[in-house]
Amino acid sequence: MDRRSWLWRRKSSEKSPGETESTGSVSSHSERFSDDQRSQSPELNSKPVTREEEATADIKILTERLSAALLNVSLKEDLAKQHAKVAEEAVSGWEKAENEAAALKQQLDASTSKVSALEDRNSHLDSALKECVRQLWQGREEQNQKIEEAINNKCKEWETTKSQLEARIEELQARQDVTTSSVHEDLYPKLEALEKENSALKLQLLSKSEEVKIRTIERDLSTQAAESASKQQLEGIKKLTKLEAECRKLRVMVRRSDNSSDLKSSIDNQSDYSGRVSFSDNEMQSPSEKIIGKSSMATSVDIGLMDDFLEMEKLAALPHSEPGRKHSESNKELEKSNAHVNQLKHELKTSLRRISELEEKVEMVEVEKLQLEMALNGSKEQIEALQSRLKEIEGKLSEMKKLEAENQELELLLGESGKQMEDLQRQLNKAQVNLSELETRRAEKLELTMCLNGTKKQLETSQNRLKETERKLTELQTLLHLTKDAKEAAEDGLKAANGKTEAIESRLKDVEAEAESLILKIKSLEDVTEKERALSAKHNSKCNELQDEISKLKQELEHHQETEPAPNHIKGFELKQEKELAVAASKFAECQRTIASLGQRLQSLATFEDFLIES
Protein backbone atom coordinates (compact mmCIF):
# COMPACT_ATOMS: atom_id res chain seq x y z
CA MET A 1 0.00 0.00 0.00
CA ASP A 2 2.76 2.45 0.95
CA ARG A 3 4.73 1.57 -2.15
CA ARG A 4 1.76 2.18 -4.48
CA SER A 5 0.94 5.52 -2.81
CA TRP A 6 4.59 6.52 -3.06
CA LEU A 7 4.64 5.72 -6.78
CA TRP A 8 1.44 7.72 -7.32
CA ARG A 9 2.94 10.68 -5.46
CA ARG A 10 6.12 10.41 -7.46
CA LYS A 11 4.18 10.48 -10.74
CA SER A 12 2.16 13.51 -9.64
CA SER A 13 5.35 15.30 -8.56
CA GLU A 14 6.96 14.46 -11.89
CA LYS A 15 3.97 15.94 -13.80
CA SER A 16 3.65 19.11 -11.67
CA PRO A 17 6.56 20.94 -13.42
CA GLY A 18 4.67 20.74 -16.75
CA GLU A 19 1.65 22.29 -15.17
CA THR A 20 3.74 25.09 -13.69
CA GLU A 21 5.34 25.68 -17.05
CA SER A 22 1.96 25.87 -18.80
CA THR A 23 0.56 28.24 -16.18
CA GLY A 24 3.70 30.33 -16.41
CA SER A 25 3.36 30.58 -20.21
CA VAL A 26 -0.32 31.63 -19.96
CA SER A 27 0.48 34.27 -17.36
CA SER A 28 3.31 35.57 -19.56
CA HIS A 29 0.90 35.92 -22.54
CA SER A 30 -1.65 37.77 -20.40
CA GLU A 31 1.04 40.08 -19.09
CA ARG A 32 2.22 40.79 -22.60
CA PHE A 33 -1.36 41.50 -23.72
CA SER A 34 -1.92 43.93 -20.82
CA ASP A 35 1.39 45.64 -21.58
CA ASP A 36 0.37 46.05 -25.20
CA GLN A 37 -2.89 47.55 -24.09
CA ARG A 38 -1.09 49.88 -21.74
CA SER A 39 1.41 50.88 -24.42
CA GLN A 40 -1.30 51.39 -26.99
CA SER A 41 -3.60 53.45 -24.77
CA PRO A 42 -1.35 56.56 -24.69
CA GLU A 43 -0.80 56.23 -28.39
CA LEU A 44 -4.56 56.30 -28.94
CA ASN A 45 -4.82 59.28 -26.71
CA SER A 46 -1.85 61.00 -28.19
CA LYS A 47 -2.21 60.31 -31.91
CA PRO A 48 -5.39 60.70 -33.91
CA VAL A 49 -6.14 57.68 -36.04
CA THR A 50 -8.81 56.84 -38.41
CA ARG A 51 -11.67 54.48 -37.78
CA GLU A 52 -10.35 51.93 -40.18
CA GLU A 53 -7.08 51.76 -38.42
CA GLU A 54 -8.87 51.46 -35.14
CA ALA A 55 -11.03 48.70 -36.52
CA THR A 56 -8.04 46.86 -37.87
CA ALA A 57 -6.27 47.37 -34.60
CA ASP A 58 -9.30 46.11 -32.70
CA ILE A 59 -9.52 43.13 -35.01
CA LYS A 60 -5.86 42.39 -34.42
CA ILE A 61 -6.29 42.76 -30.70
CA LEU A 62 -9.32 40.49 -30.74
CA THR A 63 -7.53 37.93 -32.84
CA GLU A 64 -4.61 38.03 -30.47
CA ARG A 65 -6.95 37.64 -27.52
CA LEU A 66 -8.71 34.77 -29.23
CA SER A 67 -5.41 33.08 -29.96
CA ALA A 68 -4.31 33.58 -26.37
CA ALA A 69 -7.64 32.25 -25.10
CA LEU A 70 -7.43 29.29 -27.43
CA LEU A 71 -3.94 28.62 -26.17
CA ASN A 72 -5.13 28.82 -22.58
CA VAL A 73 -8.05 26.51 -23.37
CA SER A 74 -5.80 23.98 -25.09
CA LEU A 75 -3.37 24.14 -22.20
CA LYS A 76 -6.15 23.61 -19.68
CA GLU A 77 -7.51 20.71 -21.69
CA ASP A 78 -4.05 19.14 -21.68
CA LEU A 79 -3.81 19.68 -17.95
CA ALA A 80 -7.26 18.15 -17.46
CA LYS A 81 -6.30 15.14 -19.57
CA GLN A 82 -3.10 14.76 -17.58
CA HIS A 83 -5.01 15.00 -14.31
CA ALA A 84 -7.50 12.41 -15.57
CA LYS A 85 -4.70 10.07 -16.59
CA VAL A 86 -3.03 10.52 -13.21
CA ALA A 87 -6.31 9.83 -11.46
CA GLU A 88 -6.90 6.72 -13.56
CA GLU A 89 -3.39 5.51 -12.85
CA ALA A 90 -3.90 6.19 -9.16
CA VAL A 91 -7.18 4.26 -9.18
CA SER A 92 -5.62 1.37 -11.09
CA GLY A 93 -2.66 1.39 -8.68
CA TRP A 94 -5.03 1.39 -5.74
CA GLU A 95 -6.95 -1.52 -7.22
CA LYS A 96 -3.74 -3.37 -7.90
CA ALA A 97 -2.62 -2.70 -4.33
CA GLU A 98 -5.93 -4.01 -3.02
CA ASN A 99 -5.64 -7.10 -5.23
CA GLU A 100 -2.10 -7.67 -4.05
CA ALA A 101 -3.20 -7.25 -0.46
CA ALA A 102 -5.97 -9.81 -1.02
CA ALA A 103 -3.49 -12.19 -2.66
CA LEU A 104 -1.11 -11.71 0.23
CA LYS A 105 -3.92 -12.40 2.67
CA GLN A 106 -4.73 -15.56 0.76
CA GLN A 107 -1.07 -16.52 0.82
CA LEU A 108 -1.00 -15.85 4.55
CA ASP A 109 -4.05 -18.03 5.03
CA ALA A 110 -2.48 -20.76 2.91
CA SER A 111 0.79 -20.44 4.81
CA THR A 112 -1.04 -20.63 8.15
CA SER A 113 -2.88 -23.73 6.93
CA LYS A 114 0.41 -25.22 5.74
CA VAL A 115 2.02 -24.35 9.06
CA SER A 116 -0.81 -26.07 10.89
CA ALA A 117 -0.44 -29.10 8.59
CA LEU A 118 3.29 -29.06 9.18
CA GLU A 119 2.69 -28.88 12.92
CA ASP A 120 0.42 -31.89 12.67
CA ARG A 121 3.02 -33.67 10.56
CA ASN A 122 5.69 -32.63 13.07
CA SER A 123 3.65 -34.12 15.88
CA HIS A 124 3.26 -37.35 13.90
CA LEU A 125 6.97 -37.34 13.14
CA ASP A 126 7.74 -36.75 16.82
CA SER A 127 5.62 -39.74 17.76
CA ALA A 128 7.24 -41.83 15.02
CA LEU A 129 10.67 -40.66 16.15
CA LYS A 130 9.88 -41.63 19.71
CA GLU A 131 8.80 -45.06 18.54
CA CYS A 132 11.96 -45.38 16.46
CA VAL A 133 14.08 -44.36 19.43
CA ARG A 134 12.28 -46.88 21.60
CA GLN A 135 12.81 -49.60 19.01
CA LEU A 136 16.46 -48.60 18.70
CA TRP A 137 16.92 -48.86 22.43
CA GLN A 138 15.20 -52.23 22.47
CA GLY A 139 17.37 -53.45 19.56
CA ARG A 140 20.51 -52.17 21.24
CA GLU A 141 19.59 -53.79 24.52
CA GLU A 142 18.91 -57.07 22.73
CA GLN A 143 22.17 -56.72 20.82
CA ASN A 144 24.07 -56.00 24.02
CA GLN A 145 22.48 -59.03 25.66
CA LYS A 146 23.45 -61.19 22.68
CA ILE A 147 26.98 -59.79 22.78
CA GLU A 148 27.26 -60.48 26.50
CA GLU A 149 25.91 -64.01 26.02
CA ALA A 150 28.33 -64.63 23.15
CA ILE A 151 31.21 -63.25 25.22
CA ASN A 152 30.27 -65.44 28.16
CA ASN A 153 29.98 -68.49 25.91
CA LYS A 154 33.34 -67.72 24.32
CA CYS A 155 34.93 -67.21 27.73
CA LYS A 156 33.58 -70.55 28.88
CA GLU A 157 34.81 -72.23 25.71
CA TRP A 158 38.24 -70.64 26.08
CA GLU A 159 38.39 -71.70 29.72
CA THR A 160 37.50 -75.29 28.81
CA THR A 161 40.02 -75.33 25.96
CA LYS A 162 42.60 -73.78 28.25
CA SER A 163 42.03 -76.44 30.89
CA GLN A 164 42.21 -79.16 28.23
CA LEU A 165 45.42 -77.72 26.81
CA GLU A 166 46.96 -77.44 30.26
CA ALA A 167 46.09 -81.08 30.98
CA ARG A 168 47.52 -82.11 27.63
CA ILE A 169 50.69 -80.11 28.30
CA GLU A 170 51.09 -81.80 31.66
CA GLU A 171 50.64 -85.22 30.04
CA LEU A 172 53.14 -84.38 27.32
CA GLN A 173 55.62 -83.07 29.87
CA ALA A 174 55.29 -86.29 31.86
CA ARG A 175 55.76 -88.34 28.69
CA GLN A 176 58.73 -86.22 27.75
CA ASP A 177 60.33 -86.69 31.14
CA VAL A 178 59.81 -90.46 30.98
CA THR A 179 61.08 -90.72 27.41
CA THR A 180 64.08 -88.49 28.06
CA SER A 181 65.06 -90.46 31.14
CA SER A 182 64.69 -93.82 29.35
CA VAL A 183 66.47 -92.55 26.25
CA HIS A 184 69.31 -91.08 28.28
CA GLU A 185 69.72 -94.30 30.25
CA ASP A 186 69.75 -96.41 27.07
CA LEU A 187 71.69 -94.15 24.77
CA TYR A 188 74.46 -92.63 26.89
CA PRO A 189 76.51 -95.86 27.33
CA LYS A 190 75.89 -96.77 23.70
CA LEU A 191 77.01 -93.34 22.59
CA GLU A 192 80.17 -93.55 24.70
CA ALA A 193 81.01 -97.01 23.31
CA LEU A 194 80.31 -95.88 19.77
CA GLU A 195 82.45 -92.79 20.22
CA LYS A 196 85.33 -94.92 21.48
CA GLU A 197 84.96 -97.35 18.58
CA ASN A 198 84.74 -94.46 16.16
CA SER A 199 87.94 -92.89 17.52
CA ALA A 200 89.79 -96.25 17.36
CA LEU A 201 88.59 -96.85 13.81
CA LYS A 202 89.64 -93.37 12.82
CA LEU A 203 93.14 -94.03 14.18
CA GLN A 204 93.27 -97.34 12.30
CA LEU A 205 92.13 -95.62 9.15
CA LEU A 206 94.81 -92.97 9.50
CA SER A 207 97.53 -95.58 10.02
CA LYS A 208 96.32 -97.72 7.12
CA SER A 209 96.05 -94.68 4.88
CA GLU A 210 99.63 -93.72 5.73
CA GLU A 211 100.81 -97.27 4.97
CA VAL A 212 98.94 -97.21 1.68
CA LYS A 213 100.57 -93.92 0.79
CA ILE A 214 104.04 -95.34 1.56
CA ARG A 215 103.35 -98.48 -0.48
CA THR A 216 102.03 -96.45 -3.39
CA ILE A 217 105.15 -94.27 -3.30
CA GLU A 218 107.38 -97.39 -3.30
CA ARG A 219 105.40 -98.90 -6.16
CA ASP A 220 105.68 -95.71 -8.17
CA LEU A 221 109.44 -95.64 -7.61
CA SER A 222 109.82 -99.31 -8.63
CA THR A 223 107.72 -98.77 -11.76
CA GLN A 224 109.81 -95.75 -12.67
CA ALA A 225 113.05 -97.80 -12.23
CA ALA A 226 111.65 -100.64 -14.33
CA GLU A 227 110.61 -98.20 -17.05
CA SER A 228 114.10 -96.68 -17.17
CA ALA A 229 115.71 -100.18 -17.28
CA SER A 230 113.41 -101.28 -20.08
CA LYS A 231 114.25 -98.16 -22.03
CA GLN A 232 117.97 -98.85 -21.63
CA GLN A 233 117.48 -102.48 -22.69
CA LEU A 234 115.62 -101.35 -25.80
CA GLU A 235 118.44 -98.97 -26.65
CA GLY A 236 121.00 -101.82 -26.20
CA ILE A 237 118.93 -104.05 -28.50
CA LYS A 238 118.86 -101.33 -31.12
CA LYS A 239 122.64 -100.99 -30.89
CA LEU A 240 123.04 -104.77 -31.25
CA THR A 241 120.96 -104.75 -34.42
CA LYS A 242 123.18 -102.02 -35.77
CA LEU A 243 126.26 -104.12 -34.92
CA GLU A 244 124.78 -107.09 -36.77
CA ALA A 245 124.28 -104.93 -39.82
CA GLU A 246 127.94 -103.81 -39.64
CA CYS A 247 129.07 -107.42 -39.27
CA ARG A 248 127.20 -108.36 -42.39
CA LYS A 249 128.91 -105.54 -44.21
CA LEU A 250 132.26 -106.86 -42.98
CA ARG A 251 131.37 -110.33 -44.25
CA VAL A 252 130.69 -108.91 -47.67
CA MET A 253 134.01 -107.12 -47.61
CA VAL A 254 135.81 -110.34 -46.56
CA ARG A 255 134.18 -112.27 -49.39
CA ARG A 256 135.36 -109.67 -51.88
CA SER A 257 138.91 -109.88 -50.66
CA ASP A 258 138.85 -113.69 -51.19
CA ASN A 259 140.76 -114.41 -48.04
CA SER A 260 141.36 -117.70 -46.32
CA SER A 261 139.10 -119.88 -44.26
CA ASP A 262 140.02 -118.06 -41.07
CA LEU A 263 137.86 -115.26 -42.15
CA LYS A 264 135.14 -117.74 -43.02
CA SER A 265 135.39 -119.37 -39.64
CA SER A 266 135.29 -116.01 -38.00
CA ILE A 267 132.28 -115.17 -40.07
CA ASP A 268 130.68 -118.46 -38.97
CA ASN A 269 131.48 -117.58 -35.40
CA GLN A 270 130.03 -114.18 -36.06
CA SER A 271 126.85 -115.75 -37.46
CA ASP A 272 126.65 -117.98 -34.38
CA TYR A 273 127.15 -114.94 -32.28
CA SER A 274 124.44 -113.11 -34.23
CA GLY A 275 122.08 -116.06 -33.71
CA ARG A 276 122.85 -116.03 -30.04
CA VAL A 277 122.41 -112.31 -29.96
CA SER A 278 119.07 -112.60 -31.78
CA PHE A 279 118.04 -115.32 -29.32
CA SER A 280 119.06 -113.10 -26.45
CA ASP A 281 117.19 -110.24 -28.10
CA ASN A 282 114.06 -112.35 -28.22
CA GLU A 283 114.58 -113.28 -24.59
CA MET A 284 115.02 -109.61 -23.76
CA GLN A 285 111.98 -108.53 -25.72
CA SER A 286 109.66 -111.03 -24.04
CA PRO A 287 110.30 -109.74 -20.49
CA SER A 288 110.40 -106.18 -21.79
CA GLU A 289 106.94 -106.70 -23.24
CA LYS A 290 105.82 -108.21 -19.97
CA ILE A 291 107.32 -105.51 -17.79
CA ILE A 292 107.78 -102.00 -19.15
CA GLY A 293 109.78 -99.48 -17.25
CA LYS A 294 111.58 -101.45 -14.44
CA SER A 295 115.15 -101.25 -12.89
CA SER A 296 118.10 -99.21 -14.23
CA MET A 297 121.00 -100.61 -16.35
CA ALA A 298 124.65 -99.79 -15.87
CA THR A 299 126.10 -97.14 -18.10
CA SER A 300 129.22 -99.24 -18.83
CA VAL A 301 127.32 -101.46 -21.33
CA ASP A 302 126.23 -98.43 -23.29
CA ILE A 303 129.82 -97.09 -23.38
CA GLY A 304 131.21 -100.44 -24.61
CA LEU A 305 128.62 -100.74 -27.34
CA MET A 306 129.39 -97.23 -28.50
CA ASP A 307 133.12 -98.04 -28.69
CA ASP A 308 132.41 -101.18 -30.75
CA PHE A 309 130.22 -99.23 -33.08
CA LEU A 310 132.96 -96.63 -33.63
CA GLU A 311 135.57 -99.34 -34.36
CA MET A 312 133.25 -100.96 -36.90
CA GLU A 313 132.80 -97.64 -38.64
CA LYS A 314 136.57 -97.20 -38.80
CA LEU A 315 136.95 -100.61 -40.41
CA ALA A 316 134.31 -99.79 -42.97
CA ALA A 317 136.06 -96.52 -43.75
CA LEU A 318 139.45 -98.20 -44.57
CA PRO A 319 140.31 -98.60 -48.32
CA HIS A 320 140.16 -102.00 -50.10
CA SER A 321 143.88 -101.96 -51.09
CA GLU A 322 145.00 -103.46 -47.75
CA PRO A 323 143.39 -106.92 -47.48
CA GLY A 324 145.89 -108.59 -45.20
CA ARG A 325 145.88 -105.77 -42.74
CA LYS A 326 142.13 -105.75 -42.82
CA HIS A 327 141.94 -109.47 -42.19
CA SER A 328 144.14 -109.27 -39.12
CA GLU A 329 142.35 -106.24 -37.80
CA SER A 330 138.99 -107.85 -38.44
CA ASN A 331 140.04 -110.91 -36.48
CA LYS A 332 141.06 -108.74 -33.58
CA GLU A 333 137.85 -106.81 -33.75
CA LEU A 334 135.84 -110.04 -33.87
CA GLU A 335 137.56 -111.27 -30.78
CA LYS A 336 136.86 -107.99 -29.06
CA SER A 337 133.23 -108.13 -30.19
CA ASN A 338 132.91 -111.69 -28.87
CA ALA A 339 134.25 -110.54 -25.55
CA HIS A 340 131.82 -107.65 -25.51
CA VAL A 341 128.97 -109.97 -26.46
CA ASN A 342 129.83 -112.24 -23.57
CA GLN A 343 129.84 -109.24 -21.26
CA LEU A 344 126.48 -108.18 -22.65
CA LYS A 345 125.07 -111.66 -22.06
CA HIS A 346 126.24 -111.56 -18.49
CA GLU A 347 124.75 -108.11 -17.98
CA LEU A 348 121.49 -109.23 -19.60
CA LYS A 349 121.30 -112.17 -17.21
CA THR A 350 121.86 -109.87 -14.26
CA SER A 351 119.22 -107.45 -15.57
CA LEU A 352 116.77 -110.33 -16.04
CA ARG A 353 117.40 -111.43 -12.46
CA ARG A 354 116.79 -107.92 -11.25
CA ILE A 355 113.63 -107.70 -13.36
CA SER A 356 112.31 -110.96 -11.89
CA GLU A 357 113.09 -109.68 -8.41
CA LEU A 358 111.26 -106.46 -9.21
CA GLU A 359 108.28 -108.47 -10.50
CA GLU A 360 108.19 -110.41 -7.27
CA LYS A 361 108.31 -107.16 -5.33
CA VAL A 362 105.49 -105.73 -7.48
CA GLU A 363 103.39 -108.84 -6.83
CA MET A 364 104.03 -108.48 -3.12
CA VAL A 365 103.03 -104.82 -3.31
CA GLU A 366 99.84 -105.74 -5.17
CA VAL A 367 99.01 -108.40 -2.58
CA GLU A 368 99.58 -105.89 0.19
CA LYS A 369 97.47 -103.40 -1.75
CA LEU A 370 94.62 -105.91 -1.96
CA GLN A 371 94.94 -106.59 1.75
CA LEU A 372 94.84 -102.87 2.46
CA GLU A 373 91.80 -102.47 0.21
CA MET A 374 90.06 -105.29 2.06
CA ALA A 375 90.91 -103.61 5.35
CA LEU A 376 89.61 -100.32 3.97
CA ASN A 377 86.36 -101.95 2.87
CA GLY A 378 85.95 -103.51 6.31
CA SER A 379 86.63 -100.18 7.97
CA LYS A 380 84.14 -98.54 5.59
CA GLU A 381 81.50 -101.12 6.52
CA GLN A 382 82.18 -100.48 10.19
CA ILE A 383 81.93 -96.73 9.55
CA GLU A 384 78.63 -97.23 7.71
CA ALA A 385 77.29 -99.29 10.60
CA LEU A 386 78.38 -96.57 13.00
CA GLN A 387 76.76 -93.97 10.77
CA SER A 388 73.51 -95.96 10.73
CA ARG A 389 73.65 -96.11 14.54
CA LEU A 390 74.31 -92.40 14.64
CA LYS A 391 71.35 -91.81 12.31
CA GLU A 392 69.12 -93.86 14.62
CA ILE A 393 70.32 -91.82 17.56
CA GLU A 394 69.75 -88.62 15.59
CA GLY A 395 66.21 -89.82 14.73
CA LYS A 396 65.50 -90.34 18.41
CA LEU A 397 66.94 -86.93 19.18
CA SER A 398 64.77 -85.39 16.42
CA GLU A 399 61.74 -87.08 18.01
CA MET A 400 62.73 -85.51 21.30
CA LYS A 401 63.04 -82.16 19.56
CA LYS A 402 59.61 -82.64 17.99
CA LEU A 403 58.15 -83.29 21.43
CA GLU A 404 59.81 -80.14 22.69
CA ALA A 405 58.43 -78.23 19.66
CA GLU A 406 54.94 -79.57 20.41
CA ASN A 407 55.29 -78.38 23.99
CA GLN A 408 56.35 -74.98 22.73
CA GLU A 409 53.38 -74.89 20.35
CA LEU A 410 51.04 -75.71 23.21
CA GLU A 411 52.60 -72.92 25.24
CA LEU A 412 52.11 -70.58 22.28
CA LEU A 413 48.47 -71.68 22.05
CA LEU A 414 48.05 -70.86 25.72
CA GLY A 415 49.60 -67.45 25.10
CA GLU A 416 47.30 -66.90 22.14
CA SER A 417 44.28 -67.91 24.22
CA GLY A 418 45.35 -65.36 26.82
CA LYS A 419 45.68 -62.74 24.08
CA GLN A 420 42.22 -63.63 22.79
CA MET A 421 40.83 -63.22 26.31
CA GLU A 422 42.46 -59.80 26.40
CA ASP A 423 40.92 -58.98 23.01
CA LEU A 424 37.49 -60.01 24.31
CA GLN A 425 37.96 -57.79 27.34
CA ARG A 426 38.90 -54.94 25.01
CA GLN A 427 35.77 -55.60 22.98
CA LEU A 428 33.74 -55.45 26.19
CA ASN A 429 35.34 -52.12 27.02
CA LYS A 430 34.55 -50.88 23.52
CA ALA A 431 30.94 -52.02 23.93
CA GLN A 432 30.73 -50.11 27.21
CA VAL A 433 32.17 -47.03 25.47
CA ASN A 434 29.59 -47.42 22.71
CA LEU A 435 26.86 -47.62 25.35
CA SER A 436 28.11 -44.39 26.90
CA GLU A 437 28.16 -42.78 23.45
CA LEU A 438 24.60 -43.96 22.86
CA GLU A 439 23.56 -42.42 26.16
CA THR A 440 25.18 -39.13 25.15
CA ARG A 441 23.36 -39.30 21.82
CA ARG A 442 20.12 -39.93 23.67
CA ALA A 443 20.75 -36.82 25.76
CA GLU A 444 21.48 -34.88 22.57
CA LYS A 445 18.22 -36.11 21.09
CA LEU A 446 16.38 -34.97 24.21
CA GLU A 447 18.01 -31.58 23.83
CA LEU A 448 16.93 -31.51 20.20
CA THR A 449 13.35 -32.32 21.24
CA MET A 450 13.52 -29.42 23.71
CA CYS A 451 14.81 -27.21 20.92
CA LEU A 452 11.93 -28.38 18.74
CA ASN A 453 9.45 -27.45 21.47
CA GLY A 454 11.09 -24.05 21.75
CA THR A 455 10.87 -23.60 17.99
CA LYS A 456 7.19 -24.55 18.16
CA LYS A 457 6.62 -21.81 20.71
CA GLN A 458 8.52 -19.38 18.54
CA LEU A 459 6.37 -20.36 15.59
CA GLU A 460 3.25 -19.67 17.64
CA THR A 461 4.55 -16.24 18.62
CA SER A 462 5.51 -15.54 15.00
CA GLN A 463 2.01 -16.54 13.90
CA ASN A 464 0.56 -14.03 16.37
CA ARG A 465 2.92 -11.40 15.06
CA LEU A 466 1.93 -12.23 11.49
CA LYS A 467 -1.73 -11.77 12.39
CA GLU A 468 -0.93 -8.43 14.03
CA THR A 469 1.60 -7.12 11.46
CA GLU A 470 0.19 -7.85 8.00
CA ARG A 471 2.05 -4.91 6.44
CA LYS A 472 5.55 -6.28 7.17
CA LEU A 473 6.10 -7.97 3.85
CA THR A 474 9.78 -8.68 4.38
CA GLU A 475 9.12 -10.87 7.39
CA LEU A 476 6.34 -12.55 5.48
CA GLN A 477 8.73 -13.25 2.63
CA THR A 478 11.20 -14.88 4.98
CA LEU A 479 8.40 -16.89 6.52
CA LEU A 480 7.24 -17.79 3.04
CA HIS A 481 10.70 -19.06 2.23
CA LEU A 482 10.64 -21.12 5.40
CA THR A 483 7.22 -22.46 4.55
CA LYS A 484 8.44 -23.25 1.03
CA ASP A 485 11.32 -25.26 2.48
CA ALA A 486 8.94 -27.06 4.78
CA LYS A 487 6.63 -27.59 1.84
CA GLU A 488 9.48 -29.09 -0.15
CA ALA A 489 10.33 -31.36 2.77
CA ALA A 490 6.68 -32.34 3.08
CA GLU A 491 6.51 -32.92 -0.66
CA ASP A 492 9.63 -35.08 -0.43
CA GLY A 493 7.99 -37.05 2.36
CA LEU A 494 4.81 -37.34 0.32
CA LYS A 495 6.86 -38.45 -2.68
CA ALA A 496 8.58 -41.08 -0.55
CA ALA A 497 5.21 -42.20 0.82
CA ASN A 498 3.81 -42.22 -2.72
CA GLY A 499 6.83 -44.29 -3.84
CA LYS A 500 6.20 -46.74 -1.02
CA THR A 501 2.51 -46.90 -1.86
CA GLU A 502 3.39 -47.41 -5.52
CA ALA A 503 5.78 -50.21 -4.59
CA ILE A 504 3.08 -51.77 -2.41
CA GLU A 505 0.55 -51.38 -5.22
CA SER A 506 2.97 -52.97 -7.71
CA ARG A 507 3.54 -55.79 -5.26
CA LEU A 508 -0.22 -56.19 -4.84
CA LYS A 509 -0.56 -56.25 -8.62
CA ASP A 510 2.12 -58.92 -8.84
CA VAL A 511 0.36 -60.92 -6.13
CA GLU A 512 -2.96 -60.52 -7.95
CA ALA A 513 -1.32 -61.60 -11.23
CA GLU A 514 0.15 -64.63 -9.47
CA ALA A 515 -3.25 -65.40 -7.97
CA GLU A 516 -4.87 -65.11 -11.39
CA SER A 517 -2.22 -67.37 -12.91
CA LEU A 518 -2.80 -69.87 -10.09
CA ILE A 519 -6.57 -69.69 -10.69
CA LEU A 520 -5.99 -70.32 -14.39
CA LYS A 521 -3.74 -73.24 -13.54
CA ILE A 522 -6.40 -74.61 -11.20
CA LYS A 523 -9.02 -74.27 -13.92
CA SER A 524 -6.76 -76.02 -16.42
CA LEU A 525 -6.07 -78.75 -13.87
CA GLU A 526 -9.82 -79.11 -13.26
CA ASP A 527 -10.36 -79.44 -17.01
CA VAL A 528 -7.62 -82.05 -17.19
CA THR A 529 -9.15 -83.92 -14.26
CA GLU A 530 -12.58 -83.84 -15.92
CA LYS A 531 -11.07 -85.13 -19.17
CA GLU A 532 -9.23 -87.85 -17.33
CA ARG A 533 -12.39 -88.78 -15.45
CA ALA A 534 -14.24 -89.05 -18.76
CA LEU A 535 -11.42 -91.16 -20.16
CA SER A 536 -11.49 -93.35 -17.06
CA ALA A 537 -15.26 -93.77 -17.46
CA LYS A 538 -14.76 -94.72 -21.11
CA HIS A 539 -12.07 -97.19 -20.15
CA ASN A 540 -14.30 -98.65 -17.46
CA SER A 541 -17.12 -99.06 -19.96
CA LYS A 542 -14.73 -100.67 -22.44
CA CYS A 543 -13.44 -102.97 -19.73
CA ASN A 544 -16.98 -103.97 -18.82
CA GLU A 545 -17.77 -104.62 -22.48
CA LEU A 546 -14.61 -106.70 -22.85
CA GLN A 547 -15.50 -108.65 -19.71
CA ASP A 548 -18.98 -109.31 -21.12
CA GLU A 549 -17.48 -110.44 -24.44
CA ILE A 550 -15.00 -112.68 -22.65
CA SER A 551 -17.75 -114.23 -20.57
CA LYS A 552 -19.88 -114.76 -23.69
CA LEU A 553 -16.97 -116.35 -25.54
CA LYS A 554 -16.26 -118.61 -22.60
CA GLN A 555 -19.90 -119.67 -22.45
CA GLU A 556 -19.93 -120.37 -26.20
CA LEU A 557 -16.76 -122.41 -25.93
CA GLU A 558 -18.11 -124.41 -23.06
CA HIS A 559 -21.36 -124.97 -24.96
CA HIS A 560 -19.50 -126.15 -28.08
CA GLN A 561 -17.26 -128.43 -26.05
CA GLU A 562 -20.25 -130.00 -24.36
CA THR A 563 -22.36 -130.47 -27.53
CA GLU A 564 -19.90 -131.63 -30.21
CA PRO A 565 -16.55 -133.37 -30.46
CA ALA A 566 -13.96 -130.98 -31.78
CA PRO A 567 -12.84 -131.64 -35.35
CA ASN A 568 -9.71 -130.04 -36.75
CA HIS A 569 -11.28 -126.84 -38.05
CA ILE A 570 -13.21 -126.47 -34.82
CA LYS A 571 -10.01 -126.96 -32.91
CA GLY A 572 -8.39 -124.22 -35.02
CA PHE A 573 -11.36 -122.00 -34.31
CA GLU A 574 -11.00 -122.73 -30.62
CA LEU A 575 -7.32 -121.91 -30.78
CA LYS A 576 -8.15 -118.59 -32.45
CA GLN A 577 -10.73 -117.91 -29.79
CA GLU A 578 -8.23 -118.71 -27.10
CA LYS A 579 -5.72 -116.34 -28.72
CA GLU A 580 -8.41 -113.68 -28.93
CA LEU A 581 -9.21 -114.30 -25.30
CA ALA A 582 -5.54 -113.92 -24.38
CA VAL A 583 -5.34 -110.66 -26.36
CA ALA A 584 -8.52 -109.45 -24.71
CA ALA A 585 -7.13 -110.39 -21.29
CA SER A 586 -3.93 -108.45 -22.05
CA LYS A 587 -6.02 -105.46 -23.16
CA PHE A 588 -8.08 -105.79 -20.02
CA ALA A 589 -4.89 -105.78 -17.91
CA GLU A 590 -3.65 -102.69 -19.78
CA CYS A 591 -6.98 -100.97 -19.16
CA GLN A 592 -6.72 -101.79 -15.47
CA ARG A 593 -3.21 -100.36 -15.40
CA THR A 594 -4.32 -97.14 -17.12
CA ILE A 595 -7.24 -96.87 -14.69
CA ALA A 596 -4.84 -97.27 -11.75
CA SER A 597 -2.47 -94.64 -13.19
CA LEU A 598 -5.41 -92.27 -13.77
CA GLY A 599 -6.56 -92.81 -10.21
CA GLN A 600 -3.09 -91.97 -8.92
CA ARG A 601 -2.98 -88.81 -11.06
CA LEU A 602 -6.42 -87.80 -9.80
CA GLN A 603 -5.24 -88.28 -6.22
CA SER A 604 -2.14 -86.16 -6.90
CA LEU A 605 -4.29 -83.45 -8.51
CA ALA A 606 -6.67 -83.52 -5.56
CA THR A 607 -3.76 -83.10 -3.14
CA PHE A 608 -2.40 -80.24 -5.30
CA GLU A 609 -5.83 -78.51 -5.32
CA ASP A 610 -6.01 -78.85 -1.53
CA PHE A 611 -2.52 -77.35 -1.28
CA LEU A 612 -3.50 -74.42 -3.52
CA ILE A 613 -6.67 -73.83 -1.54
CA GLU A 614 -4.72 -73.85 1.73
CA SER A 615 -2.09 -71.48 0.28
Swiss-Prot record:
Coiled-coil residues: 87-121, 148-211, 327-563
UniProt keyword Ion transport present: no
Claim: Coiled coil is one of the keywords in the record: yes
Region (Disordered): 1-55, 258-289, 319-343
InterPro entries assigned to the protein according to its UniProt record, in alphabetical order: FPP_plant (IPR008587)
Assigned keywords, A-Z: Coiled coil
One Gene Ontology term from the biological process aspect of the record: regulation of exocyst localization
Record's compositionally biased regions (Polar residues): 19-28, 39-48, 262-288
Any GO MF annotation of the entry: protein-macromolecule adaptor activity
Basic and acidic residues bias: start-end ranges: 1-18, 29-38, 322-343
Main location: other
Cellular localization per UniProt: Vesicle
Gene Ontology cellular component annotations, sorted alphabetically: cytoplasmic vesicle
Pfam families per record: FPP
Tissue-by-tissue expression: Accumulates in preferentially xylem cells.
Subunit-structure text: Interacts with WPP/MAF proteins. Binds to COG2; this interaction promotes the association between cortical microtubules and EXO70A1.
Sequence similarity: Belongs to the FPP family.
PANTHER family noted in UniProt: FILAMENT-LIKE PLANT PROTEIN 3, FILAMENT-LIKE PLANT PROTEIN 4
Role summary: Ensures, when in complex with COG2 and FPP2/VETH2, the correct secondary cell wall (SCW) deposition pattern by recruiting exocyst components to cortical microtubules in xylem cells during secondary cell wall deposition by recruiting EXO70A1.
Name of the molecule in the record: Filament-like plant protein 3
Gene transcribed to yield this protein: FPP3
